Amino acid sequence: MRGHTGDYGIDGSFHIVSARAQLVGVAGVSAALLLWSVTRWARGRRLTAALAAAGGGGVAGSAALYGYATRVGKFVVWDRVLDDLRLRGDETLLDLGCGRGAVLLAAAKRLPRGRAIGVDLWRADQTGNSPSATLANAALENVADRVEVRTADMTALPFADASFDVVVSSLAIHNIRTPGGRRQALSEAVRVLRPGGRLAIADLWGTREHADRLRALGWRNVRHRNLGWRMWYGGPWVSTRLVTATKPGVSAAG
């Protein structure tokens, strides 16, 4: 895994209840269940004790998986996804819903002669999102000279047709509330990609529909796969899946 020095926060919204308070709550519930299992065991209630211990361990394990995914796992996974794109280094890349820049800046490191542009509405799906936070991370990662951020809606992108060589998105499109809005976000990604351009979307749900639609549009090399335990947000029931595809046509680079 390539190192990163920026502050990328914790995936999720913590405006009502802080991440610290939620962590304390989870720890409290887990400890209470484990303590109760001990008392049940001492009183001969073996089945109840086992169920309580399993519940306490499950709560703790789920929290640990979530923390790992948001602080470590997604960086490992996206390093591999970006490596698989085999970027030349001179592409123009767009990140839909870039947040604090975890994927945007990892991509920018691979674009010494290119440009990485991130768009976001800077809402609550990742606490502390702001253009200034992303640009501060770009400076910390030494890629500020090739990074740009815009406040923009991914369903109505402020870019001309065929503006980008690569479009990526991580855990963002699912935040659009309506199916029609999510379809429109994919339509915009399709529109702004150049012929021969590559698309990589990682998300918690809706990815199979994206893949089916891209196949119907005649896109090449459409792949849909589970990204594995490193991006389990609490467990396999909240797993992340990836869609990759290539737009029909030949890029200007050949």
Q: Predicted segment positions?
A:
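N-terminal auxiliary segments of SAM/dcSAM-dependent transferases
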Residues: 1-56, 64-67
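A short acidic, Gly/Pro-enriched loop at the edge of an enzyme's catalytic core
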Residues: 88-91, 152-167
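Conserved class I S-adenosyl-L-methionine
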Residues: 89-99, 117
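Conserved SAM-binding loop of SAM-dependent methyltransferases across substrates and taxa
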Residues: 100-112
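Helix-to-beta-strand junctions that scaffold the AdoMet/dcAdoMet cofactor pocket
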Residues: 111, 176-177, 193-195
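A short glycine-rich, Lys/Arg-flanked "PGG" loop and its adjoining helix->strand segment in the class I
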Residues: 182-195
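Conserved beta-strand signature within the Rossmann-like core of class I S-adenosyl-L-methionine
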Residues: 196-203
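Core SAM-dependent methyltransferase catalytic element
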Residues: 218, 222, 229-254
